[in-house]
Amino acid sequence: MSQITLIILVLAIGFSCTKSHPINSTRDGEDSGTDLKNLLTEPANTTYATNSTLTRKELNSTIQPERNDEGSAIRKIMASKKDENITGQSEINTSAKSQPINSTRDGEDSGTDLKNLLTEPANTTYATNSTLTRKELNSSIPPERNDEGSAIRKIMASKKDEIITGQSEINTIAKSQPINSTRDGEDSGTDLKNLLTEPANTTYATNSTLTRKELNSSIPPERNDEGSAIRKIMASKKDEIITGQSEINTIAKSQPINSTRDGEDSGTDLKNLLTELANTTYLTNSTLTRKELNSTIQPERNDEGSAIRKIMASKKDENITGQSEINTSAKSQPINSTRDGEDSGTDLKNLLTDPANTTYATNSTLTRKELNSTIQPERNDETSAIRKIMASRKDENVTGQSEFNISTNSNLNTTTHHEDAVVSPTEKVYVPNNASSAELNVSSTIQPKEADVTTSSANDIKKPAFPYCIILITFQIVTVGMIIYLVFRTMRKPCQSERAIPLNSFGFGNNSSYE
């Protein structure tokens, strides 16, 4: 009788160590008055599906489970935070939901306090085989694996915002956003001080033949079979989406302070801009199976038909689209800003990603090596078109196509009247091959600016001189004429006095002799 009582007491204590539902919380993340400030991980509506043949060794406890034998359960370690639960079992399909308060799925700021939200996996699916052994399963938060089965050991770094992750085939770029910074660089007044993990632009490239040894788990880990699906984790930021698939080419951008896209100083305060992901291209094969595709936050192709998965980026006006054949013209022009980094007096403080008139033309046969998605992108195969970047002037249109004809107005240094003049080449005309799509600015070519303040001044243009020379020549002619006249008059007087004129008694000439 005492043994039966003891067994009942042990079972009652075991059932009491379960995770209660969060108060006033809904599955769809709508605000129901719940204080999620200190909630780290709250899996809700968790379903445990285990086989009846599993023994005590193959099941484990949740909160602080210790399993040390070879029976193949998952060892979970209770993290340091009091509100974090780690759960593992042999076959589990968990849709863990812990939506932030007043937060929208598309990442628009709705005044949510995400201060202490560390990891929020949303709609996470755990699919493990019951035949997996202890070696093929691993733990998540601070996972400890010490046998020869070769799982990947994750160590939680000392810094609260630092995650150290290692695996055999993975290219991960870890993101740790600064305080009061959103994904698009606009200050949204959010205190992200205690956000621990923000991986941005993580690339998962796995083959269907990869084994458990070649896959690993990150903070909320959690693919453990050989099928090799890609696990998506919802980052702590409400407006950050991390996406990975079998073949992905992601370029992560990390802007320096006071720097433009090409690194020239434009007086811009980009202090808190950490990652600028622009024009990401996702290339997947149509032969990928369900295992090789995964679901993101708004996921959402899971069969083998290979549709295109679209992900809404954090910026409400920025779309990141991936498909096998993509031709995207992303437009998000900065105000008075130059793509080439010349200072145009523009405040680029909150401009995070400004792809301008970018054209992607790829062939369906291009491989992952032949595609890339840089900010100022560049051609890598022999069939692709030429991508042009927006030039410095705000009134200049840049068009990219395979054949590009640039007609630049040069220095003429002459006018129609053949008078020397200074003409500045301030207007550039880009003439594409497709005449139907080209619109030329006639005023900028036929009537170029003659006196631009940046290149010439009013003193540089020669004005017509006042006709002083004509007056001087006239004066000289008159002077010479007067001199000649006086000389000839003087020479004529002795000729007139050759005859002697007799004088009378009065001293006057007597003219009587002439009579």
Curated annotation (Swiss-Prot):
Protein family (similarity comment): Belongs to the polydnaviridae Glc1.8 protein family.
Extracellular domain ranges by topology: 21-467
Signal peptide: 1-20
Assigned keywords, A-Z: Glycoprotein, Host membrane, Host-virus interaction, Inhibition of host innate immune response by virus, Membrane, Signal, Transmembrane, Transmembrane helix, Viral immunoevasion
Taxonomic lineage from the root: Viruses, Viruses incertae sedis, Polydnaviriformidae, Bracoviriform, Microplitis demolitor bracovirus
Descriptive protein name: Mucin-like protein Glc1.8b
Residues linked to a glycan: 24, 45, 51, 60, 85, 93, 102, 123, 129, 138, 180, 201, 207, 216, 258, 279, 285, 294, 319, 327, 336, 357, 363, 372, 397, 405, 413, 434, 441
Compositionally biased region (Polar residues): 86-104, 320-338
Membrane topology of this protein: Single-pass membrane protein
Known role: Involved in suppression of the insect cellular immune response. Inhibits host hemocyte adhesion and phagocytosis.
Record bears the keyword Endoplasmic reticulum: no
Transmembrane segments: 468-488
Location of region: Disordered: 80-114, 314-358, 393-413
